[in-house]
Structures are given as C-alpha cells and as structure tokens.
From Swiss-Prot:
<feature type="binding site">
    <location>
        <position position="132"/>
    </location>
    <ligand>
        <name>Ca(2+) 3</name>
    </ligand>
</feature>
<feature type="binding site">
    <location>
        <position position="19"/>
    </location>
    <ligand>
        <name>Ca(2+) 1</name>
    </ligand>
</feature>
<feature type="binding site">
    <location>
        <position position="17"/>
    </location>
    <ligand>
        <name>Ca(2+) 1</name>
    </ligand>
</feature>
<keyword id="KW-0132">Cell division</keyword>
<feature type="domain" description="EF-hand 3">
    <location>
        <begin position="77"/>
        <end position="112"/>
    </location>
</feature>
<feature type="domain" description="EF-hand 1">
    <location>
        <begin position="4"/>
        <end position="39"/>
    </location>
</feature>
<dbReference type="GO" id="GO:0051301">
    <property type="term" value="P:cell division"/>
</dbReference>
<feature type="binding site">
    <location>
        <position position="53"/>
    </location>
    <ligand>
        <name>Ca(2+) 2</name>
    </ligand>
</feature>
<feature type="domain" description="EF-hand 2">
    <location>
        <begin position="40"/>
        <end position="75"/>
    </location>
</feature>
<feature type="binding site">
    <location>
        <position position="55"/>
    </location>
    <ligand>
        <name>Ca(2+) 2</name>
    </ligand>
</feature>
<feature type="binding site">
    <location>
        <position position="21"/>
    </location>
    <ligand>
        <name>Ca(2+) 1</name>
    </ligand>
</feature>
<feature type="binding site">
    <location>
        <position position="28"/>
    </location>
    <ligand>
        <name>Ca(2+) 1</name>
    </ligand>
</feature>
<feature type="binding site">
    <location>
        <position position="130"/>
    </location>
    <ligand>
        <name>Ca(2+) 3</name>
    </ligand>
</feature>
<feature type="binding site">
    <location>
        <position position="126"/>
    </location>
    <ligand>
        <name>Ca(2+) 3</name>
    </ligand>
</feature>
<keyword id="KW-0106">Calcium</keyword>
<dbReference type="InterPro" id="IPR000629">
    <property type="entry name" value="RNA-helicase_DEAD-box_CS"/>
</dbReference>
<feature type="binding site">
    <location>
        <position position="128"/>
    </location>
    <ligand>
        <name>Ca(2+) 3</name>
    </ligand>
</feature>
Amino acid sequence: LTEEQKQDIREAFDLFDTDGSGTIDAKELKVAMRALGFEPKKEEIKKMIADIDKDGSGTIDFEEFLQMMTAKMGERDSREEIMKAFRLFDDDETGKISFKNLKRVAKELGENMTDEELQEMIDEADRDGDGEVNEEEFFRIMKKTSLF
C-alpha cells in the first residue's frame, strides 16, 4: 500500500470510530467500507469481523482494519488487471470472448493451437453454455488457474 492509501484507510477508520474508542463495531465497519468504495453484504461484514477479531471483542482495532483493507485492495487490483486482459480479447466489445476473439489472440501471440484446443478453452470457461466467455466466467477461470 502507498502512504496515501494507508492515510485514506486511517481517515476512514477515525471517521467511523465515532466514540473515539480506537475500535469500530459491525455497523461502523459497514459505513467505513462503503466510504472506501466497497458494497459489503451483512454476512460479509460478520465474517470479516469474525476472521479478524481474534480476541472476541466484537470490534476491530486499526491494525486489524488495515490488514483487512490491504487484502481487499489487493483483490480489487487483481480484478482490474484481469478485466484489462479481458478487454484485450474482447476487441469487438461485445462483452464476451468468442471463439473468433480467442483465435485472433492466439495467432497474434504466435501460439499454434488447433481449433479443437481453442474450443476446449472456451468450453472450460463457459459456465452458462452460450458458447462464449463473459467477464465473470473469465474472472473465475483466471482465479482458478491462479494466473492472477
């Protein structure tokens, strides 16, 4: 994290530690995360507190908050990188990677792949059976293969 990002996280933490206790509870955490551009669900908040709140106090101190947000921001960065890669494939901007898109990229990269191999790649990632790979399917397969 940059110093600026750390400062942003500190400011969000202080802003939502409304009673100045040095800790934030579940309700305060939800508001703090929204301020940083996340839309956490109630279950996510509960899980985050449970994962971080080692002493069982039901609240999070700044160090715990910083660790959690650092991980979250890393996730967001890798998602942005994956979406950039997606857009390189989706040159016709349909929001999906077609067989034709994949074939073009393979050719540009000098990969000698058969049509069957390319189709297998599409089939592996294609969850909804429409014969193409949408953003979510692409994200999922990239995460699954640990390329990001």
